[in-house]
Amino acid sequence: MSHLVSIIIPCYNNADTIQEALDSVYNQTYKEFEVIVVNDGSQDQSAEKIREYQESYAELIFLNQDNRGPSAARNYGASIAKGHYIIFLDGDDRLHEEYISTCIDHFESDATLDLVYSVTELFENESGVFFLAEYDPKTILIQNCFPITAMIRRKDFFANGQFDEKLRIAEDWEMWIRHTREFPNVKKIDRKLFFYRKRVTKDSISDLNKVNNTIDDAHLYIYNKHYQLYREAGWHIIDLLSSRREYLKYKKKYYDQWFKKVFRWVKGVK
């Protein structure tokens, strides 16, 4: 039995890459899918590029919203999705042509699965495999274990509460923390079927952190939101700090900013 798959693509200033992302979807060997692109208030030529693509693929669903961040854009797309399964793909990344068919094969061969994903390969400014820790309920509390493109059931996504729209970064990690608590059976495909673009831009994580401590605020928010889970797992805020510090390779001055912020926050917790 063929199941419809909804591919939801948030797009913010991706004029130079959105058609490449769409090509990777429309070149899939599995053809039972719908594509929903949500323009999140782009200020470049993204909207024009998407409309141009619609000239060849009239069935492409194109939505516009004011800039509210990737969480809100994905939730908006999901709200009109009709697929049995959903995949979120960012507007500057790509899927291997067999990504959907391979995920579907695993779901159909094992009805107990809740989430299927593949090895991630970097491209553009970096190459090689993008490291993600193997999932277990404790590890995911200190680092993300899944790419945004993991395939899940649409009904499970809504049962889980969707993306937290208060987050504009690390929103996928926070969502996976919640999702895997309710739907813990995951399958990793040992093939490079998702391509994650690494770019050198002013939007990079380190630059965001310089401007307004975006990462720090997100991690503190996640720790506070899931405080009981961290306590039950035996993780403390310093464990989260150490893990992210190593993973992101911040410079020392940013470690110091983070630690001072954490210290002030912890002092306020009674």
PLM segments and residue spans:
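C-terminal subregions of glycosyltransferases and related glycan-biosynthesis enzymes
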Residues: E174, R181-K188, K192-K270
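Nucleotide-sugar donor-binding/catalytic module of glycosyltransferases
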Residues: M1-N213
